[in-house]
Amino acid sequence: MRKLTFFLSICAAAVGSASAQKRNITEKDLFDFVWVGDPQISPDGSRVVFVRVTVNEKKEGYNTSLWSVPTAGGEEPHQLTKGDHDGQPRWSPDGKFIAFVRANEKDGKPEPPQLSILPMSGGDSFAFTDLPKGAADPKWSPDGKTIAFTSSNNPEDLAKQEKKKQKEEELKKAVTASSSPSPSPSKSGATAKATADPVKITAEALVKKAEAEAEHESDIQVITHAVYREDNDGYLDAKHPQHIWTVTAPKNADEKVQPKQLTSGRFDEGNVVWSKDGARIYYTSRHTDEPYYELAKTEIYAVAATGGESTKINTLELDAQDLSLSPDGKQLAFLGAVTQPVNSYTQPDLWIVDLAPNAKPRNLTEKFDSDLGAGVFGDNAPPRADGGNVPIWSQDGKSLIEIYGKEGRTILASFDVATGNATDLTHGNQAVGRFRTSADGSTIVYTVSTATRISDLFALPANGGEPKQLTNSNDKLFSQLNLTEPEEISYQSFDGKKIQAWVQKPPNFDAAKKYPLILNIHGGPHAAYGYIFEHEFQWMAAKGYVVLYPNPRGSTTYGQDFGNVIQYHYPGDDFKDLMAGVDELIKRGYIDNNKLGVTGGSGGGLLTNWVIGQTPRFAAAVAQRDIASWSDWWYSADFTLFQASWFKAPPFEDEADFKARSPITYIKNVKTPTMFILGEVDYRTPPGAGGEQMFRALKFRKIPTAMVRFPNESHELSRSGQPWHRVERLQHIVGWFDKWLMGAAKPEYDVAPQDEVPAKKDSAAKTPPNE
């Protein structure tokens, strides 16, 4: 017995030692994160190809490459491609090739992506398009002979490219001639040099001539549309709409193929789907020059795979996305939201429509009060090449697989085509991301994230059984970290409405102690927190903060009414939901009421500004990509509110409503030291309508404030910005809270940093005379 006790003591000591060796997560661990995206299962169901995303060596961007793993598990994933920017892998119907897109780098920046093919029998991949604007979204024809894709090239681009190639060929020949040896070796060196010089001069002259003849391209823009730029994409180019192209699938690098443009016109096209017999291609478009004056609608077209005029099949009075062809080729499934009544938020549903002229679509999930095709979000989805989902038909056409959001979780489910009834395929506190099935429907592969795991790949038998984990992308790193599971709580708001929230506590949390609190508010406003990895929250907790992240009214995953209840009242009662959550934690006894912080991004930035204008209880705030003035935002955002979704009228017709709901209106009430995090190319919430206003007003009022600006960063800074910028963002947020909640010295946020403090009054320095 004594020996057993001694043995158990040794084991306990070993476990304790292993635990002690773990460290807290840091902001810079992001540099070592690995993301898994866009899984594609082989036709025979034996393997999955996926995109592996990592931070590049300079920590200024991301590398993406294709990897493969068997669906049966038991093997480590292995790398298929070695490009820095490979993505969108798509298996050929016979499983012998993978088409994908690759963007090569020039001068440190990715060029337009081109279509490439990887032979699965062995050998290197090869590119087979060379289009000025690149190519994307490859789709194999059913017979595997042709690939459809989208591109925004126009005839002018192609003509310029051809002209440039001809010039380069002329220069190449001239340079080759100039470097050739003298044909008369018997001549003296001086004479030989004189003989070669005219050729060299000719080459230089050709270069200068080409430069002189290069057409000047104006860089001004004449804008006639209300929507003229998009966040993360920049200013829109009406001369380059996205169209449908096809190209013969080459079998090797020596086979030269010529892409063919199938559609044309001034409107974008997408959602490409091949007909079952490969004779036609279906796609969606909207032939309206200024769609913001109307409610959303989607037009479905068909074009012959050999080319010709497109035929409009249907006009759907909703915004349809993610088309999927039924096994018999007679129906399309898609996701879409109704447009009437005009809501602030309308849940997407799963629809089916016959491929017959003007057929009426059927809402499969009309009575299913959840968000189809969406769920919870975090800060660590793959920052590049994540891919997307489409509803997947069962082989017999009797069911469809899709994800939905429910109370902080994202669930994969099967929906009965006849009844709309749902059967959950995944369970537990997690968020399903991307999913695919094998051709026979027997195997489902999908990505999953949890509160302590960045997405990994899993395989699940469609007829039931336990999921099998195929990748362990971050296990080596995470095994070294003290990550804590958040506590799910619920509380009643002022009107009795139940609010769900999560509490991220520090490692080795002690309920007898008092901790500073950070209230973290999500954006959207129609979005949801939940069981998904949040690097930001884990790091805040590791730094000694308790983090509260609630889903106030207006959040998704709680039904249509809960999501839309804030229409024309945002901000409003959602603020009360947030304060009720803070009160709930304070009642639990482990929060220091004098050390309350608040932060949030986008809609969360708006609410952060709102909070500090409504209550002085917070000792520090960080508003990120925020809104200060609804009126200024109405005029400058990258999308319009011409429809009465968030406001009943424009600001010049209802100034009082815009003013009443704008945080800047209440700036005179603010006492909280506040930082503003801004992306300089954020077109979703432009800095001039948000943080710049708040910062200037607080400076006038002599309230401590700082503005942190991130060059070349859009609204997506926190999720897909440059890695260094993402890390610096976290450092500044926590740094500000450290200063005001922890009492840390942060001279970088002082008007006069310590090394530039003016001399004391009793010093020998004197004020220089006026000159």
State each model region's role:
Residues 33-48, 83-101, 124-125, 130-148, ...:
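Conserved beta-propeller blade repeats
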Residues 63-64, 152-253, 284, 294-301, ...:
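Predominantly five- to eight-bladed beta-propeller fold
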Residues 27, 75-78, 123-125, 256-261, ...:
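Predominantly a core beta-strand signature of beta-propeller blades
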Residues 326, 431-771:
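Serine-hydrolase catalytic core recognition
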Residues 70-74, 119-123, 249-253, 304-308, ...:
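Short loop/turn segments that connect beta-strands within beta-propeller blades
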Residues 58-64, 106-113, 236-241, 291-298, ...:
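Short, solvent-exposed loop/turn segments at conserved positions within beta-propeller repeat blades
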Residues 28-64, 238-242:
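Beta-strand-rich domains and repeat architectures in extracellular enzymes and scaffolds
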